[in-house]
Amino acid sequence: MNSPLRGIWLWLPLLLTWLTPEVSSSWWYMGATGGSARVMCDNVPGLVSSQRQLCHRHPDVMRAIGLGVTEWTSECQYQFRQHRWNCNTLDRDHSLFGRVLLRSSRESAFVYAISSAGVVFAITRACSQGEVKSCSCDPKKMGSGKDSKGVFDWGGCSDNIDYGIKFARAFVDAKERKGKDARALMNLHNNRAGRKSVKRFLKQECKCHGVSGSCSLRTCWLAMADFRKTGDYLWRKYNGAIQVVMNQDGTGFTVANERFKKPTKNDLVYFENSPDYCIRDRETGSLGTAGRVCNLTSRGMDSCEVMCCGRGYDTSHVTRMIKCGCKFHWCCAVRCQDCLEALDVHTCKAPKNADWTSPT
């Protein structure tokens, strides 16, 4: 091989590394990695050195994070259940979502936020349940306190959300902090918005003590709300996400359109418009909507017109078993009958383009 060609071949792997976009949060794959924490730490691809160090030092926290992946991906799928892109995950893909999140879109903003929130939630819950050696209940919630109802004593186990946020920041943001590009700044912003969203729904719960429930004495603690509240909140932020561009010195954002308000730390931000997700597309990672169930009577995103992108739909007649004729029997059971229900199911037609059958 002559010298110029040989030089090109030597540089080719490095050029491909520079030019190929990468989904940063390979730690998402921790939920799919079985075995011990050590096996998980060594086999999740793409972790930076500080993430691997935290992984080996805190195997109990990593187990919590791994279990939490299932929870936040399920919440993502719930929020997008009626949309063309439904937060579907890919088996044996360490990025979990494939090429879809390479684009700096609203969907990427939401996934980074909900995943960061999921880590905070999972770690904080594990602390309260005594599953993490390095943390427990919130040590600051001791002694007495006061609210609109009067004085109370801190007791029980207040969720140590500050520990969850601190660990999540150190672990999740580690790879983004190594990068100085626009996408890294976008991810860091949305990660922070996700962490803050969990703390927003921290609520005070109390138990009354006293003669005949007089509540002359109260014991209170702080508890995280159900993760659905965080998911609903971030969904609203997704719908109000703000498109931005990098400022001139490359240190932050400015709005892409002067009509938009400046994003706060609680807002989600994105750079690129989303694809329509109508058809399978190798470049964008879209799986398309062929075969998706649609709602014939809806006028929303789940309608057959919108979901199927104007391609039409097929209708199949199916029967399913449901509970019916339920009656309450004293005391204390509800008994139901099993009934067959006939219904029509509408699914989106595939495009006529033969390329549809090609795998992504």
Swiss-Prot record:
Function: Ligand for members of the frizzled family of seven transmembrane receptors. Functions in the canonical Wnt signaling pathway that results in activation of transcription factors of the TCF/LEF family. Functions as a upstream regulator of FGF10 expression. Plays an important role in embryonic lung development. May contribute to embryonic brain development by regulating the proliferation of dopaminergic precursors and neurons.
Post-translational modification: Palmitoleoylation is required for efficient binding to frizzled receptors. Depalmitoleoylation leads to Wnt signaling pathway inhibition.
Keywords of this entry: Developmental protein, Disulfide bond, Extracellular matrix, Glycoprotein, Lipoprotein, Secreted, Signal, Wnt signaling pathway
Name by which UniProt lists this protein: Protein Wnt-2
UniProt cross-references to Gene3D superfamilies, sorted A to Z: 3.30.2460.20
Lipid positions (O-palmitoleoyl serine): S212
Glycosylation (residues): N295
Organism: Aotus nancymaae
Cellular component, GO annotation: cytoplasm; extracellular space
SS bonds (residue pairs): C76-C87, C127-C135, C137-C157, C206-C220, C208-C215, C278-C309, C294-C304, C308-C348, C324-C339, C326-C336, C331-C332
Signal peptide: 1-25
GO biological process, alphabetically ordered: atrial cardiac muscle tissue morphogenesis; canonical Wnt signaling pathway; cardiac epithelial to mesenchymal transition; cardiac muscle cell proliferation; cell fate commitment; cell proliferation in midbrain; cell-cell signaling; cellular response to transforming growth factor beta stimulus
Stored CDD domains: Wnt_Wnt2
PROSITE patterns from the UniProt entry: WNT1
